[in-house]
Structure formats: C-alpha cells, structure tokens
Design a protein with these regions (language model features):
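Short small-residue beta-strand/loop micro-motif enriched in glycine and branched aliphatics
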Residues: 161-166, 219, 244
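Active-site beta-loop-alpha junctions of metal-dependent nucleic acid enzymes
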Residues: 145-149, 165-189
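Conserved short alpha-helical interface segments
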Residues: 2, 43-110
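Mobile-element integrase/transposase regions
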Residues: 28-32, 36-37, 96-153
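Mobile genetic element proteins and their domesticated derivatives, centered on retroelements
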Residues: 41, 54, 75, 142, ...
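RNase H-like two-metal-ion nuclease catalytic core shared by retroviral integrases
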Residues: 197-213, 219-242, 249-261
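C-terminal domain-tail junction helix/linker
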Residues: 244-288
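Short, basic alpha-helical/linker "hinge" immediately adjacent to a nucleic-acid-recognition surface
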Residues: 1-48, 52, 56-64, 77
Length: 288
C-alpha cells in the first residue's frame, strides 16, 4: 500500500503502473552473485543431478542459510535463458531428457505373451510389509536390453531406492540366474529378502535362485510394469547413460559400478533429499 499510494491515499491506477515498472526492472541472478553457489550447482550438474535434486540438497545441507540455497527454477533459467549466461551451456547435456511414451504391446488373448513359467508366486501373494516400503531388503529387478543380445540386470531396493547393476552375458535363464546369485551374495541376508520380477523367461529357473540364496521371488502380473515402479523409473534414468541402440556388452562391470554409484549418490525427493547410498549404508550399519 505504501509503495503504491498517492500523496494521501491508495490509487489503483498508480499501483498498477508501479507494479509493472518493478516487474520490468532487471533482477540480478542469485547464481551470478555467488561464485560458491555457482560452482556447487555446476559441480552437481556434471554429476548428472537434476536441478530439483540440487535445490533439495542445498536446502537440506544449509537449512539456516538462504544465501547458499537456490530454487530449481533459477537453475533452469540460468541454463536455458541465453541472456543470463551464468552457467555454461555445456552443462545442458547433463540434464535428463524426457522419456517418450511407450507404445502399447500386443497382448496374447490367452494371457501372458512371454511364455509359461512353472511354480511362480504371484505378486498378489507378496507380504503386505513389502508394499509400504517400510522395511528394507525387498528388491525389484529387470533386464535392460541392447542390440546384439546385450543385457544389464538392474536391481533396485524398494525402501532405499539403492541400485545395483550386473553385466549379463546373455538372456538365457542359466546366465541371468547365475548373475543374480552372484549379486545377492554381496549383501547381508537381512538386506535381501525378496525379489520382484516381471514374467520374463530369463527367470524360468527362479527356484534355483531361491535355493541358492534363500530369497523369495515374486512375479508381476502380465503387462504390468507399474508393479515394479522403482525399477521402471531406474531403467529410465539409466537410459541417460545407455541410450537405446547402445551395445551394452562394451561396458565393463567396473563402469556399471560407477554408474550405479552415481545414481546412489544423487539425493531423492522421495527420500527427503537424502541419497540412496546414505539410506542403504544406514541399513547396513544396523545389521551389525
């Protein structure tokens, strides 16, 4: 009122004119004023963090210091609005592109189009404690596929969103199950209690996996990828590193471990901007 009044009272016309004048006045970008903040944002972008993750991380690590916080909108504007020129345009390549909508796949009128797997245990029989993500140790898995019969097994822990990747030499059930057994033996028993998979025939020999690891396997309903939501989301993130058409066989297990580590060190909004690594390491420590 005081900014928009006349000599003795509020004037609507003058208020409107003054408001537009203030809106047109150029404002200095927060990133331009703070070299530390600019370096911090650029460094996290180079690690493929999203602007939302960066903003959430800054707010969590500097809760009382607004000078060391910046909104994700400011980061986006600094990247996309050429006039600002605050963040280098080369950092644009580190933003994740939007996933295109998947085309629907033809469904076998008899049900599962991927073949019959014996002795499956349906996801509908999965204990309720798995559903609410309150207890760690329950994983979702899938195969990421590339040309020339190249595959990566992707595993995501539901409670912490922790990711593990395994190089797989083929899609046959013996090869896949062996790779999954090897990964399972790297973890404490308390942190690997169940695995949820789709109806892919690569897990036809799921009984051997359970016998070797004491890990229960549950299968999703046909054509229901949303029943492995964490894993589907992770596969989308992985396409930033492995675009469709990439021969996955050229990547070493060491590189897959590096990619998994990068994903696990990104803060997640769903974890109150903690990282999967922080949550998972706390779970490991609690096992003694």
């Amino acid at each position: 009122m005081s900014r928009n009044g006349g000599s003795d009272r509020y004037r609507a016309a003058l208020a409107d004119e003054n408001a537009w004048a203030r809106a047109r006045r150029p404002k200095c970008c927060k990133l331009a004023n703070s070299p530390w903040l600019r370096r911090a944002v650029a460094g996290k972008l180079r690690l493929d963090w999203s602007p939302e993750q960066i903003a959430g991380w800054l707010k969590r690590t500097h809760p009382e210091d607004e000078c060391n916080q910046v909104s994700h909108e400011t980061i986006y504007r600094s990247l996309f609005v050429q006039a600002r020129g605050v963040l280098k345009k080369e950092l644009l390549s580190h933003l994740r592109s939007k996933r295109s909508m998947r085309r629907s796949k033809p469904v076998d009128p008899n049900g599962d189009r991927r073949g019959h797997i014996k002795d499956i245990v349906s996801i509908r029989q999965r204990p309720a404690v798995v559903e609410d993500r309150a207890v760690p140790g329950h994983w979702e898995g899938d195969l990421l596929s590339g040309p020339n019969n190249s595959y990566i097994a992707t595993l995501v822990e539901r409670h912490t969103r922790y990711v593990m990747l395994a190089k797989v030499a083929g899609k046959d059930t013996q090869t896949v199950v062996c790779a999954l057994i090897k990964q399972a033996k790297k973890l404490p028993n308390e942190l690997y209690k169940s695995l949820t998979w789709d109806r892919g025939k690569e897990l036809t020999d799921h009984r051997r996996f359970t016998l070797a690891t004491k890990i229960d396997v549950y299968f999703c309903d046909p054509q229901s990828p949303w029943q492995r939501g964490s894993n589907e989301n992770t596969n989308g993130l992985l396409r930033q590193y492995f675009p469709k058409g990439t021969d996955l066989a050229v990547h070493s297990q060491a590189y897959l471990n590096k990619v998994a580590r990068q994903l696990n060190e990104r803060p997640r909004e769903t974890l109150q901007f903690e990282t999967p690594a922080e949550r998972f390491n706390a779970c490991v420590a609690s096992t003694g």
